Design a protein with these regions (language model features):
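Short, small-residue-biased leader/transition segments that mark boundaries at the very start
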Residues: 1-7
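Active-site/ligand-binding loops adjacent to catalytic centers
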Residues: 10-21, 25, 78-165, 180, ...
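Active-site/ligand-binding-proximal alpha/beta "capping" segment
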Residues: 23-68, 73, 77, 130-134, ...
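Short, well-ordered alpha-helices that flank and scaffold nucleotide-derived cofactor binding pockets
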Residues: 51, 76, 80, 175-179
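Short glycine/serine/threonine-rich phosphate/pyrophosphate-binding segments
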Residues: 64-74, 98, 166-174, 198
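Nucleotide donor/acceptor-binding cores
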Residues: 184-186
Length: 228
């Protein structure tokens, strides 16, 4: 596609911005702190969820954060349109600090666990996308990798959906939120990734064993572990 690949040995966090500054015709999109991200979800995702749940009602929304734009923008819209009635929660993987931040009423940021098999979600800070709306978040749930990997296989078996671990985490979180809100609760979440990008890991027996996750998958679903 005509792209130039730049390999850097130093910390990667600021490399794209620094590289763009050296070029006359480059734009650094600043994914995590470009608040057009959050705004897009206020204008599109939030209204779409609200419209699709108009007949059934909506009690809760929950998802994990990477940039924070999806959670923040959708939460902002749903809180405004419902008069604050829709509960909005954050789902957090191991290794992220946001669960403790919410649970301690914004007093501490401490990592829960050492890391996760999920990719692109979880944070070590408040992004510019999330910061304006963090006080609208009503609660948070820590979702362990064992539950996420089991949901990957369950959705493939029961629904024919080939989802990634981040989507699986969101589904686990939505189910737990619904249980906590009570019988008949309507909860929305985001299915944000497919398994194709991760299939050489998620469906590899060796990889699952290396992460101590094989036992988390029900034995009748092991038939989907098709790679050595």
């Amino acid at each position: 596609m005509g792209s130039e690949m730049c390999i850097r040995d130093r910390n990667y966090n600021h490399q794209a911005a620094r590289h763009a500054e050296k070029l006359d015709n480059a734009v650094w999109t600043n994914q995590f702190d470009n608040v057009a991200n959050r705004e897009a979800h206020i204008l599109t995702t939030g209204p779409e969820i609200w419209a699709q749940t108009r007949q059934t009602g909506l009690d809760g929304f929950i998802c994990a954060t990477g940039t924070g734009g999806t959670l923040a923008g959708t939460t902002r819209y749903l809180k405004d349109v419902s008069g604050g009635q829709v509960q909005c929660w954050l789902a957090d993987p191991p290794g992220s600090v946001l669960h403790t931040y919410v649970q301690t009423k914004r007093e501490r940021m401490e990592r829960t666990g050492n890391g996760s098999i999920t990719e692109g979600i979880g944070q070590g800070r408040l992004t510019s996308n999330l910061q304006p709306d963090i006080d609208l978040i009503d609660n948070s749930l820590h979702i362990e990798d064992e539950a996420s990997i089991a949901m990957v296989f369950r959705m493939l078996d029961e629904e024919g959906l080939y989802i990634g671990a981040s989507s699986a985490l969101n589904l686990v979180a939505a189910a737990r939120m619904a249980q906590k809100l009570g019988r008949g609760s309507k909860v929305a979440t985001i299915i944000c990734d497919g398994a194709a990008r991760y299939q050489t890991r998620l469906f590899s027996r060796k990889w699952l064993e290396s992460k101590s996750l094989l036992s988390a998958i029900p034995s009748h679903l092991h038939r989907y572990i098709v790679l050595p």
